[in-house]
Design a protein with these regions (language model features):
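Metal-ion/cofactor- or nucleotide/acyl-coenzyme-handling active-site neighborhoods
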Residues: 1-156
Length: 156
């Protein structure tokens, strides 16, 4: 799934993964950067463009395919689509919700640098998974987590 409108995030699709993503259906929001579609087409990958619940599609009464709503991140969009497709076991891999112990915001091999967002926001201490220690996060990740938790409660 891709929601972002920027060229820098479209570059995630500018990689050749061979057969690994051959049978993947890439779901992109209607506001996705054109380069993302160009890269998907260039590698003959299947993709679907879905409008988000924004004012312009509502204004022009674009209802034929309905909308994605309450999807501020790829994780939210993926969860929403999984629920609509009646999937029962949904696993999130790689969702940003906390900094690594070394302060990195992303994995070492992240194309925009491991500390891409490390100094972008004020760090906040929060309870780590399992409740045995505290980790650093920031307000945007906490907001994303709260929306995701509300979605899980609503659709479970």
């Amino acid at each position: 799934c891709m929601l972002e409108r920027t060229e820098i995030t479209a570059e995630f699709f500018n990689h050749d993964f061979g057969e690994f993503d051959q049978d993947v259906l890439f779901v992109c929001a209607g506001v996705v950067h054109p380069k993302a579609i160009e890269y998907l087409k260039g590698r003959n990958r299947k993709y679907l463009i879905i409008p988000r619940y924004l004012y312009f599609p509502i204004y022009i009464k674009l209802k034929y395919f309905d909308f994605l709503y309450n999807t501020p991140s790829v994780a939210h969009m993926s969860y929403f689509l999984s629920v609509l497709l009646n999937h029962k076991n949904i696993i999130f891999i790689g969702q940003d919700l906390a900094y690594a112990e070394n302060g990195n915001s992303h994995p070492d091999d992240y194309q925009n640098s491991a500390n891409y967002e490390s100094q972008m926001y004020e760090h906040i201490l929060t309870e780590a998974y399992g409740g045995k220690k505290e980790i650093k996060t920031h307000e945007v990740w906490i907001f994303f987590k709260q929306i995701l938790e509300a979605m899980i409660i609503k659709y479970h």
